[in-house]
């Protein structure tokens, strides 16, 4: 494979849609092996399946350290290493900063 990211391994969180999906597709097009790290199994599998054999879906909740540790372990086990990380995942909610608790801030 040729391209600017040939034989590189990229993990993209929130890669099941929007900007994360665009990153996954762009890096894949440039030769990267891509880990689609996504909490939504349906959209994550869709993107990884469309990208093909150089892509891997791993169900990942970035708000849970055990989940991100497990995702990283699967990525390294499958591809041998991680070269690039795109922290794209986001959460949505109707909150005001003044009303956030320490638990809310830890989750963010």
Predicted regions and their residues:
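Conserved mid-core segment of classical short-chain dehydrogenase/reductases
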Residues: 91-107
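Glycine-rich phosphate-binding loop signature in dinucleotide/nucleotide-binding domains
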Residues: 74-80
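Rossmann-fold scaffold of SDR-type NAD(P)-dependent oxidoreductases
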Residues: 13, 82-90
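Canonical Rossmann dinucleotide-binding motif of NAD(H)/NADP(H)-dependent dehydrogenases/reductases
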Residues: 2-35
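Conserved residues in the N-terminal Rossmann fold of short-chain dehydrogenase/reductase
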Residues: 36, 58-59
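Structural signature of beta-strand start/N-cap positions in the alpha/beta core
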Residues: 9, 33, 54-56, 81-83
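Conserved glycine-rich Rossmann-like NAD(P)H-binding loop of the short-chain dehydrogenase/reductase
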Residues: 30-47
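The beta1-alpha1 cofactor-binding region of Rossmann-like NAD(H)/NADP(H)-dependent oxidoreductases
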Residues: 41-42, 59-72, 102
């Amino acid at each position: 494979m040729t391209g600017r990211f040939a034989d590189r391994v990229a993990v993209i969180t929130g890669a099941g849609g929007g900007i994360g999906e665009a990153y996954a597709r762009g890096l894949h097009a440039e030769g990267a092996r891509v880990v689609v790290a996504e909490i939504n199994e349906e959209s994550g599998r869709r993107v990884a399946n469309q990208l093909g054999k150089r892509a891997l879906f791993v169900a990942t909740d970035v708000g849970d350290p055990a989940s991100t540790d497990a995702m990283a372990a699967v990525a390294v086990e499958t591809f041998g290493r991680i070269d690039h990380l795109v922290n794209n995942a986001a959460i949505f909610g109707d909150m005001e900063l003044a009303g956030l608790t320490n638990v809310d801030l830890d989750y963010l």
